[in-house]
Amino acid sequence: MKEERPIIALDFSSFEETKAFLDLFPAEEKLYVKIGMELYYAQGPDIVRYIKSLGHNVFLDLKLHDIPNTVRAAMAVLKELDIDMATVHAAGGVEMLKAAREGLGQGPTLIAVTQLTSTSEDQMRGDQNIQTSLLESVLHYSKGAAKAQLDGVVCSAQEVEAIKAVTPTGFTCLTPGIRPKGSNIGDQKRVMTPNQARRIGSDYIVVGRPITQAKDPVAAYQAIKAEWAG
């Protein structure tokens, strides 16, 4: 099911920056936000509790990757924060993914990271010694995530159609690296606009700097939301 709101990546490290950004929005505007490593490691669980207290949805993007028992226990702790979505690394293997599902339970959405959108095929082959194509690697990880009963994967929008062709109906694709037309792509290698991501079948999109660093973040958010909605 397509999420109508773009997920905003809160690429901050301080509580003050985070609060100042969220305070720009009307109280009745309930957002879906991503808390990544920088903000979570700086502020800890309290930042999740604060944002949830405002009525926003929280995607906690920590990309867990460890032995199954450790991941299971960590997910059980994160479940107590009432998060709406969490991530693990698909490279941890099917048993680790199953353990993550057991720890988090069936309520929150659980998705696996396949290949980062900052990774090119040449980098994957050189750094990871994976000699298939980038798409084949992503499809392999996606099928493993589906086998482990995860809800979906993080992937580039260019890979969405192929992933949906080899996974069960309802398997979701969350797409980072979304940039409005004409914006700076930064360190992302595989990017699309919100309109392109919608047309190709992405279920969630994540947008950070084009919103958080905009002169008018609320206007930027509303414009991207409208483009995403079609």
UniProtKB/Swiss-Prot annotation:
GO cellular-component term (any): cytosol
Enzyme class, spelled out: lyase
Reactions listed under catalytic activity: orotidine 5'-phosphate + H(+) = UMP + CO2
Pathways per UniProt: Pyrimidine metabolism; UMP biosynthesis via de novo pathway; UMP from orotate: step 2/2
Domain of life: Bacteria
Subunit structure: Homodimer.
Protein family (similarity comment): Belongs to the OMP decarboxylase family. Type 1 subfamily.
Protein name: Orotidine 5'-phosphate decarboxylase
Organism: Streptococcus pyogenes serotype M5 (strain Manfredo)
